[in-house]
Amino acid sequence: MATKSKRTLAIRAMVDRNNRYAIEEALELVKKMATTKFDESVDVAVGLGIDPRKSDQVVRGAVVLPHGTGKQMRVAVFATADKATEAREAGADIVGMEDLAELVKAGQMDFDVVIATPDAMRVVGTLGPVLGPRGLMPNPKVGTVTADVRTAVINAKGGQVRYRADKGGIVHSTIGKSSFEVKALQENLLVLIDSLRKAKPATSKGIYIRKVNLSPTMGPGVAVDLSGLG
């Protein structure tokens, strides 16, 4: 316990809470703070100028990061016939319909993403109470309800992140692993920020991107100087 406390104190001492760091400097600091034995994720929290209580200010979307997330994603697809074949050929880990639904109901959900063809939603719709709380329910707004299952599977396997602003107007995501080069993390971050800007609600007024904090899985946040976001 004492060792953990010393580590925590040492890491916190690296960060000047009153400073806003340039992107590269912030990422270098995050990598330096990732001192655990596993390859920590580099997480980002983006504070948006929205009112999440208003239905017309919901920010939700998905974007493929150019350098991926560093995580191997397992993908399940609800589809039949040719679409099921497309999904398998694209690399889906599990493909089915009623049989897959039975696995979900039994709690056997060894996957990170669920994709469904529009006609499969008659089956998937009944699984809302199970998939919804786990953030696995397919949704057309993030491209997981689609007839183009091939592209959806390739994107999910290739580093796509899905995001949604929480009740505080903050979007939480990951932009890679601490083992990534700073340049790769920076490019991933800028692609995510660009996607968030494109998702800006028309009714959002004032400053939209209000704050950006970066952190390793087991470390404190580092505030980013917004002027470097382009």
Swiss-Prot record:
Naturally occurring in which organism (per UniProt): Acidithiobacillus ferrooxidans (strain ATCC 23270 / DSM 14882 / CIP 104768 / NCIMB 8455) (Ferrobacillus ferrooxidans (strain ATCC 23270))
Gene: rplA
Keyword list, A-Z: Repressor, Ribonucleoprotein, Ribosomal protein, RNA-binding, rRNA-binding, Translation regulation, tRNA-binding
Coiled-coil spans in chain: none
Database matches in Gene3D superfamilies: 3.30.190.20, 3.40.50.790
GO annotation (BP), single: translation
Subunit structure: Part of the 50S ribosomal subunit.
Protein's name according to its UniProt entry: Large ribosomal subunit protein uL1
GO molecular function, one term: structural constituent of ribosome
Stated role: Binds directly to 23S rRNA. The L1 stalk is quite mobile in the ribosome, and is involved in E site tRNA release.
Family in the record: Belongs to the universal ribosomal protein uL1 family.
A Pfam entry, by short name: Ribosomal_L1
GO CC annotation: cytosolic large ribosomal subunit
